[in-house]
Amino acid sequence: MTTTIIGFPRIGEHRELKFITEKYFRNEIPQEELLEAAKDLRAKHWNIVKEAGITEIPSNDFSHYDNVLDAAVLFNIIPKAVQDLELTDLEKYFALARGYQGEKGDVRARPMKKWFNTNYHYIVPAIEKDTEIKLAGHKIFDEFQEAKNLGITTRPVLIGPFTLLQLTDFEEGLTATNFADSLVAAYGQVFEKLAELGAEKIQLDEPSLVKDLTAEEKALFLRIYQTLLADKKGLQVLIQTYFGDVRDIYTELTSLPVDAIGLDFVEGKETAALVATGFPADKTLYAGIVNGKNIWRNNYEKSLAVLDAIPAENVVITTSCSLLHVPFTTANEEFEPAILNHFAFAVEKLSELRDLDAIRNGQGEVALTANKELFALERVGRDAALADRLAGLTDTDYTRLPVFAERESIQREKLNLPLLPTTTIGSFPQTKEVRSTRLAFRKGNISEEEYDAFVKTQTDEWIAWQEEVDFDVLVHGEFERNDMVEYFGENLSGYLFSKNGWVQSYGMRGVKPPIIWGDVTRLNPITVKWSSYAQSRTNKPVKGMLTGPVTILNWSFPREDISIKESTLQIALAIKEEVLDLEAAGIKIIQIDEAALREKLPLRRSDWYSEYLDWAIPAFRLVHSTVAPDTQIHTHMCYSEFTDIIPAIDNMDADVISFEASRSNLVILDELKAKNFQTQVGPGVYDIHSPRVPAVDEIAHTIQAILAKVPKEKVWINPDCGLKTRGESETKASLIHLTQAAKAARKEL
């Protein structure tokens, strides 16, 4: 046996890539300095993997922003509006991801979507009628050569052609089949060039194979690979899958003339059963046995049992997916050893792979014994009172009365808001001063009184500014919060927090997911203090801002000893207490964000309700089911594809929902109309994940497009997400344009 990984974290042990890239974005360093720093980081990572004893090391898993974007640029899948910009190649690359607004033009960023069922986001490629697919880039070759110069012959990694086409937007009238042949030809050129450079093997990632496949999609996949594999240019080809099993195409996949196939034995419910039916003797099986998405130690006995049952003769032990989705290393953490021993971040998972390989070769008895002893321990006790509360829940606990239509009338009279009410999603820019002051308080360098005075000043300034700009429903800005999940987790039992557990979410944006260690209950009121203070500074309604139970669960590293359903319901009871406290404090509009609702939705439609929505939607309803009819409940959802779960979202029984719509050209509105969506809606009228400032006319045009699909009585005007990561000047300029556009639209009603 040998060992490998599908991919390694890119941003660095201390987020080096983030900080150097942001310097480049601020024009503080030239392009050459950014590229050199990235080169140094890649070398460091390759050497870490090599020194850990991993026998096959990937390359081209690094990205300056996103690996799907990298593939699009490699094959010249670049919209004409960006191609025509007189910018460097790197500037065009970032323009696709972030938009561009300057002397040389004004283009919007490409849409972002969730990467399958993770909190990573990819930039959606776009193929237009004039797109000429060809080999245009050189990143994959440069990085292979870099590693080779270090004495490391790597296995280059590239998004496979089928998945790349599946993730691409096509101009009207075009389909993937129109471009399959030209894309296959370009991949063939990649094979040829890599072979010339001395590569022995290439990894083509095809995670789209774990989804439901139509007959047409299967035919396209087979057409692509039968052509591509007809001339491999001397390379060995590994088709790598992850995030599930390949039940729809296992027979056809294993019949292809590939050299190796990577299968997920962690999330792939049927992978073991599929392999048990037989695996070709002339192929190598890359067995994804170490969880690439969670941070708990691998149970060696269980993994060895799975490996022992595999009938394949040639097996490589690997991770279930790229290690992009876990933090870098536990070496920088400060947990007690009794806690830390239960965790394995990316670097530690390399050791787990090596241990499993050694044990299989009869050389890892010490490691196996230590692992058995770890799993023999009772890690954490259970909360009996909490278990009783959960057991006592009935249908009425998940039902809010009166029904939506009656509440809508009551709230309209009570709140007395104008048509097209304006609001924001919750957070305002967290400047360097905000972050440094919070850090000083956490370190004990300033007193609680000093910190509170600072937060009050920030809140006062932004409440006053919102009144000045004439927003209808205000927010307090969340200056006291570091992260929308961690802030709540710090006030809940059962949570642990890493010091340096950063994971890439999109571009240079990192998140630090907390760890659910035990049973979850609320320790004390969390948000009432600052929501009440903000409300005392204005006569306009100020939204209470909460993170919903499903999102808290999905943006944490969950337990593996109980179901995620049970953990989510525990969190729901805790957040319910907070909702009722806010209501008692006089907060009349309470937003319960479910930004990550879709994230753990199974990739196969047949599992959507039974495995997820049947408990995730009730968990949200449990949180707000007992508030008064005149308390308005909002929710917010981030970048995801919602069009196919519209009825489930309506069934959340919120009064208002806001969501991303601007980057995706408001396509969700047609589905809302078709499904007779009842909840009031705030489709984001501009994209906050790009630094460009939308013009008033641009926002006005978006508002008119919304009003063409949604009754004016049900429309709210807001950005598409929180503003914490944006600059203050661009934020204020954009929001002023938003309110101006909304007022202009009202006059036309």
Curated annotation (Swiss-Prot):
Zn(2+) binds at residues 636, 638, 660, 721. The keyword Transmembrane does not apply. Keywords: Amino-acid biosynthesis, Metal-binding, Methionine biosynthesis, Methyltransferase, Repeat, Transferase, Zinc. SUPFAM superfamilies: UROD/MetE-like. Its EC number is 2.1.1.14. Signal peptide: none annotated. It holds the Pfam family Meth_synt_2. Its cofactor is Zn(2+). Gene3D superfamilies: 3.20.20.210. It is an enzyme of class 2 (transferase). 5-methyltetrahydropteroyltri-L-glutamate binds at residues 15-18, 114, 555, 599. L-homocysteine binds at residues 425-427, 478, 593. InterPro entries: Cbl-indep_Met_Synth_N, Cobalamin-indep_Met_synthase, Met_Synth_C/arc, UROD/MetE-like_sf. L-methionine binds at residues 425-427, 478, 593. Belongs to the vitamin-B12 independent methionine synthase family. This is 5-methyltetrahydropteroyltriglutamate--homocysteine methyltransferase. It comes from Streptococcus suis (strain 05ZYH33).
